[in-house]
């Protein structure tokens, strides 16, 4: 028979089978961010000025933050409603999907908001669409703002099925804060080229969160030529950086770059 000391060592005293610290920590809870449409254009189908979006609590894909690039993109859409109203819009890597929501409020004919097919991430986008576009109720007919889980470069069928009959490309493709994925540049450009309508344009917006890799970020626009896409700088603006204490010059991290991509003639 084992002694009391031996029993303690096997069943608790040494915590041989104890869970590691943090094993029972609850995952971070989702949270909300408010966006104000400061200049709603006359052409907008909806006059909503406040857009309240839910963000996942945490995400290895950085979908838990409302990035400067998403805010810039949303403002750009309101400033250029002719690019959206009555047109078909695709957003890649949508995260909280603010630009897609604004496109839906503006009166796009069809919006498809996509991100990596993670259940929490895609479910959160669907929540935002349901609540911002449809008032928290399921749409009674085919939704003009749809949500899809999508991996760049994969089969386009699930995205194209949302397009009107006879149309195979989107009039506007949105890429907000995606070019930091340097290994994915080719897949992003392939997807953009193949899903962009002949006379369409892509709006690419990003901030150099790692200033020492800015050259690699910008390489995206050089590589675009290999895919028959022409890059045009719209502007570079300076906002407050996302994270004040991140490494690298704050002046560089505060930049927001915006480009158009169009098919070469």
From Swiss-Prot:
Its main location: cytoplasm. Its EC number is 2.1.1.-. S-adenosyl-L-methionine binds at residues 67, 93-95, 115, 152, 176. Keywords: Cytoplasm, Methyltransferase, S-adenosyl-L-methionine, Transferase. One of its GO terms (molecular function) is protein methyltransferase activity. Residues 1-25 are annotated as: Disordered. It comes from the Eukaryota. It is found in: Cytoplasm. GO terms for cellular component: cytoplasm. One of its GO terms (biological process) is rDNA heterochromatin formation. S-adenosyl-L-methionine-dependent protein methyltransferase that trimethylates the N-terminal glycine 'Gly-2' of elongation factor 1-alpha, before also catalyzing the mono- and dimethylation of 'Lys-3'. HAMAP family: Methyltr_EFM7. Belongs to the class I-like SAM-binding methyltransferase superfamily. EFM7 family. This is Protein N-terminal and lysine N-methyltransferase EFM7. The gene is EFM7.
């Amino acid at each position: 028979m084992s002694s009391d000391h031996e029993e303690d060592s096997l069943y608790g005293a040494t915590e041989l089978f104890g869970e590691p610290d943090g094993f029972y920590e609850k995952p971070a809870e989702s949270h909300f961010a408010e966006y104000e449409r400061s200049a709603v254009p006359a052409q907008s189908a909806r006059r909503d000025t406040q857009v309240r979006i839910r963000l996942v609590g945490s995400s290895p894909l950085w979908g838990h933050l409302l990035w400067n690039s998403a805010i810039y993109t949303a403002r750009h859409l309101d400033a250029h409603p002719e690019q959206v109203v009555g047109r078909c819009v695709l957003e890649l890597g949508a995260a909280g999907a603010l630009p897609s929501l604004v496109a839906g409020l503006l009166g796009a004919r069809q919006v498809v908001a996509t991100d990596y097919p993670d259940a929490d991430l895609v479910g959160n986008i669907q929540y935002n669409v349901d609540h911002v576009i449809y008032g928290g109720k399921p749409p009674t007919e085919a939704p003009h703002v749809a949500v899809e889980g999508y991996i760049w470069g994969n089969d386009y069928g699930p995205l194209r099925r949302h397009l009107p009959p006879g149309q195979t490309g989107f009039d506007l493709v949105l890429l907000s804060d995606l070019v930091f994925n340097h290994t994915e540049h080719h897949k992003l450009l392939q997807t953009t080229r193949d899903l962009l309508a002949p006379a369409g344009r892509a709006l690419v917006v990003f901030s150099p969160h790692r200033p020492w890799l800015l050259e690699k970020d910008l390489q995206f626009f050089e590589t675009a030529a290999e895919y028959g896409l022409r890059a045009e700088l719209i502007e570079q603006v300076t906002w407050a950086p996302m994270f004040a204490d991140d490494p690298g010059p704050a002046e560089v991290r505060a930049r927001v770059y915006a480009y158009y991509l169009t098919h070469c003639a």
